[in-house]
Amino acid sequence: MRFTKLALGMLAIGIWLGSTTAYGQGKAIDVNRSSMKILVSKSGAFSAFAHNHEIEAPIAQGKIDSSGNASVQLRVDAREMRVMDPEVDVDKRAEIQRTMQGETVLDVEKFPEISYQSTSVTSRGDDHWEVRGDLTLHGKKQPVAVEVSSKDGHYRGSASIKQSDFGIEPIRIAGGTVKVKDELRIEFDIVAAQ
């Protein structure tokens, strides 16, 4: 339940997309070959009895433009995010999924989309970029920066975001003795369409 905050990490995916400027103007993101995941960690006095969570955040649509001022746009359908924890039984995973998509976390009925729009892409040397942009999640827009590297046509990177920056209070249970950390880690591997 508390790990539903991972959805915030999906927004960071858009950050790494800015690193794909080598593909040329107006290239779409290959959503079938690209991946993004959000890692949610536990904390609290009894966190040893809880689980960390991994959330799959499939990219619904994205575009990379390297003409003039490089840019990237990305969209994730929050309703398609999935809890992937294989060590958690099916019923518990379904409960975590419902909590993540419910009103207390992502509220996917009210905020079905997560988006990222770059504001700047800066080269940091061969095959490395810093991408800055705005992530919109849970109806709130916040600046997010990501370091991206490329190899063999893949653009990889990670970023950390805080749920509270997007108006989401991290899940707490048992009086706060088990809770989700405010900070989420987002990892991605992006491929531009050929």
Give the positions of each predicted feature.
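Positively charged n-region of N-terminal signal peptides that target proteins for export
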Residues: M1-L6
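Bacterial N-terminal signal peptides
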Residues: A7-G18
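Low-complexity, acidic/polar, glycine-enriched regions of mature
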Residues: A22-Q194
